[in-house]
Amino acid sequence: MNFLRKIVKNCRDEDTQKPSPVSAPLDDDDLWLPPPEYVPLKELTSKKNMRNFCINGGVKVCSPNGYSFRILRHILKSFDEIYSGNHRMIGLVKVVIGLALSGSPVPEGMNWVYKLRRTFIFQWADSRGPLEGEELEYSQEITWDDDTEFVGLQIRVIAKQCHIQGRIWCINMNPRACQLWSDMSLQTQRSEEDKDSSLLLE
């Protein structure tokens, strides 16, 4: 039993592992309406401090007994304190995590895997955000254990600047993504040039 728990705690994928009856979060698990500052975005009228990124991101959720959306929110509320990546791109990482976890998970052994591969347009306020040409390869495991339940998150985000036409990142179509961004304290402000746009402050 201890050996199995060790495997689970490390979120390892073994070929001999059998799928467990874990359950992904229910669609109606503690959802709420998105905060008002997240608005549908149109084409940006200002090109200042704007970057196109080709994103390859994913979040693997490891839990022997299933998990709820509420637990994922609880874990991510401390994201600022435990983030180990490039802090000039923490806002981008939060956006990718929110969008990935608001998608549909794929079962993989004892894990659930959320993936996101898209090209997005990000715009940062003032002089914030990554340097010109700067890229990100971020990988981190975050665990939560209260002796009765264990949940591990393996987060991986690769962001490379590219010139492919992309989508504006903040699309107000999914309240779960907005909930996760609120939990992670994603900092944005309304663009002065385009009132339908939000700028990242981190």
From Swiss-Prot:
Region (Essential for glycoprotein binding), start-end ranges: 115-151
Keyword match Acyltransferase: no
Tree of life domain: Viruses
GO cellular component: host cell cytoplasm; host cell endomembrane system; membrane; viral envelope; virion membrane
An MF annotation (GO) of this entry: structural constituent of virion
Annotated membrane topology: Peripheral membrane protein
Site label Involved in the inhibition of stress granules formation and contributes therefore to virulence, positions: V95
Motif (PPXY motif): 35-38
Keywords: Host cytoplasm, Host membrane, Host-virus interaction, Membrane, Phosphoprotein, Viral budding, Viral budding via the host ESCRT complexes, Viral envelope protein, Viral matrix protein, Viral release from host cell, Virion
Main location: virion
Listed InterPro entries: Rhabdo_M, Rhabdovirus_M_sf
Intracellular or extracellular location(s): Virion membrane; Host endomembrane system; Host cytoplasm
Complex and partners: Homomultimer. Interacts with nucleoprotein and with the cytoplasmic domain of glycoprotein. Interacts with host ATP6V1A; this interaction plays an important role in virion uncoating after viral entry.
Miscellaneous remark of the record: Most abundant protein in the virion.
Function: Plays a major role in assembly, budding and uncoating of virion after membrane fusion. Completely covers the ribonucleoprotein coil and keep it in condensed bullet-shaped form. Inhibits viral transcription and stimulates replication. Plays a major role in early induction of TRAIL-mediated apoptosis in infected neurons. Inhibits the integrated stress response (ISR) in the infected cell by blocking the formation of stress granules.
Similarity remark: Belongs to the lyssavirus matrix protein family.
The protein's name in its UniProt record: Matrix protein
Taxonomic source organism: Rabies virus (strain ERA) (RABV)
